[in-house]
């Protein structure tokens, strides 16, 4: 976005002449003293410790599942451990060929392993194993399912300053920890900040990190991504941990504005801009954000915030972070603004399909030079926690088999993995069938969606992001054959909610309260995340088993569901929604939420009365039903209503209010006495009409509603202007 150009906001440093060949500052001009041996192997001091008696790992201990990424140094695979004590656990495996690494790159790799082995912090990726073969080096790291911050920043979400503050605060704690160990990160950029499944950050890729080596604790290497480089890194005058705080400022600027502060047409021009350009401060930023940026963008590193004796404490004390509770943040008790859409432990939907579509293959390494193994001597490492008593309970591990596949770029077809059985249900644009997974003989349901009639991307994303909720149907697998999309979900063996209730010989008001509580709690969770279902008819609320326990209810069929988005198609965080959304957008969102509550009101009425509120019989026309709905006319007397509690009638009336903006919210439903005091409700039996009459009336009600309004067609988020502008292509190399 265009930035308002102001007068010179930051002081300038004297510009160091650039080498015309490569755009880099020459060593002598930059104050870098040449070394007679070029300092290649002496660039860092490598220290190494391995726990005595620990069992070493090797490549045979890991099953290759998918390619997650590929860069100049090697590939990253998703792997599953197949040996004890952590068999079944998923990791990211970074594989590097010794023969293709230059000496300097080998030092970087050894350095990355040493740094990761020494660092244990909630916001830094954890190293679990490190080992080598004759031709390759292996780093076994946390598998972080949320992908990298760059993908989130560029393709999906509208962040506010409060949202950015969360990520920057976690990042400050991670950097502070590295600095306390004498480590300069030097490659801070969104691509190296990963998200876990909850949305917390993890710093990764330590190939350019460096432990300070001279008496002034300065490093001199020219490294990092040029747009994020500090001036002292560009001119090679020697840099300390203060260089990371400049990069931190660049990241903050990019997240707040969507653009980089210094970016030329090529590398040389970018470095020139970093050293001498005037930059206008965007006036739409808060004064606190502007103040922090000015304090970080000091070209003299000695004057930069964070460079003083207190280090990161200077950053943490800045007024921009006045609302952050740093202790709660460190304990991961502050809720992230964005939750990645990942469901199963080995989902890789958020990794570039250029890589995840490839067959994972760890090719034999070419034997390196004779000295290579000596250079990497002592490379093996086993995380301490893995050697503890295996009898102790551990966190839930991934199952030994996986049915989750990648959505795009596969050469797989649904019938390769599943046997299709009978039809369960038919809709206007999809059909649902029972299916059996061939490898495990497990039963599932598959929803086959005709892509020419509906774009399923929103439904898939919502199920991935929120399907972990205990009362939302779980998405197990996704296939795409260009004409149809196949959504494999858990099988609802207990059938529809109304079928179960109306077939019971005994159903009471108290039981109805427990049912509504479970469903309302789930709807309140969705609404709090900016998601509206918009099709909460009873046939989309099913039991996962035949127990009839309300906790076994699942909300299904998110085909009409929506996530709250900005005009450019990007998702809005709750903070963004609360502060920056136009009233008409909020009004529409409130209307959709009101429709969900109305549907729950219809369900509640039917459970209590034994018949539907607006359809009186098979002879009703859609026009008659719509007239009753629009006038808000329904009866609360006679039949079961003579014995139903007054609090129940009050709740029904407030949920079925004719004005959607005057209906109770899901949160208010949960706070209603009929829900909070359910144990005091009557347990007398409620009578009901014939099951088919009730279901017929319900079907007629929703049929009349659907015929009265057109269904909006939602476009995929990839079609948004901002998403298209920020699409990038990662470099491809062969390992």
From Swiss-Prot:
Its cofactor is Mg(2+). The active site is at 187 (proton acceptor), 535 (proton acceptor). Upon extracellular signal or mitogen stimulation, phosphorylated at Thr-573 in the C-terminal kinase domain (CTKD) by MAPK1/ERK2 and MAPK3/ERK1. The activated CTKD then autophosphorylates Ser-380, allowing binding of PDPK1, which in turn phosphorylates Ser-221 in the N-terminal kinase domain (NTDK) leading to the full activation of the protein and subsequent phosphorylation of the substrates by the NTKD. GO terms for cellular component: cytoplasm; cytosol; glutamatergic synapse; nucleoplasm; postsynaptic density; spindle; synapse. It is an enzyme of class 2 (transferase). It comes from the Eukaryota. The modification Phosphothreonine is found at residues 359, 573. The modification Phosphoserine is found at residues 54, 221, 307, 363, 369, 380, 732. Activated by phosphorylation at Ser-221 by PDPK1. Autophosphorylated on Ser-380, as part of the activation process. May be phosphorylated at Thr-359 and Ser-363 by MAPK1/ERK2 and MAPK3/ERK1. One of its GO terms (biological process) is positive regulation of hepatic stellate cell activation. ATP binds at residues 68-76, 94, 424-432, 447. Belongs to the protein kinase superfamily. AGC Ser/Thr protein kinase family. S6 kinase subfamily. This is Ribosomal protein S6 kinase alpha-1. It comes from Rattus norvegicus (Rat). The lineage of its organism: Eukaryota, Metazoa, Chordata, Craniata, Vertebrata.
